[in-house]
Amino acid sequence: MENIMDEKGQMILLFAFVVVIVVLTLSYVYAQNIIAGVESSRAMLAFPKEEIRNLEEIQKNFGGDSEVNSQIQTLCAKNGWVCYVGVDKVEFKNVEVDYCAGSDC
C-alpha cells in the first residue's frame, strides 16, 4: 500500500514539473513577442520617412532663411540623400555612389 502512495506523489511532482516548464516556455515566448513589437515600433519611428517629413515641415516654416536651407542640405548629405531645397518644398532622392580608383573601372 505504501508503494501506491509513493507513485501518486511522484506523478504529482512530475506533472507539476511539466506544468512549470510549459509556463516558463510560454512566458519566454510572450516576452520575446513583446520585445519584437517594441523594436518594430522603434524601427518605424526611425524610418527616414519621418525624418523627411520633419525636414519638409521645417522648410515650410523657415523656408526663407538661407542658413536653414544649407543645414537641411547638410543633414541630407550626412544620411546619403540628395536634397533640393526650393521655396515651397524639399525634394529627396536616395543616391548611392560607388568610387573606383583603379584601372579596373
UniProtKB/Swiss-Prot annotation:
Organism field: Archaeoglobus fulgidus (strain ATCC 49558 / DSM 4304 / JCM 9628 / NBRC 100126 / VC-16)
Give the UniProt entry's GO cellular component terms. Answer: membrane
Query: Membrane topology for this entry?
Result: Single-pass membrane protein
Any stretches that span the bilayer, and where are they?
Answer: 13-35
Organism ancestry: Archaea, Methanobacteriati, Methanobacteriota, Archaeoglobi, Archaeoglobales
For this UniProt record, give its keywords in alphabetical order, as a comma-separated list: Membrane, Transmembrane, Transmembrane helix
The protein's location, in the record's own words, is: Membrane
Q: What name appears for this protein in its UniProt entry?
A: Uncharacterized protein AF_0761
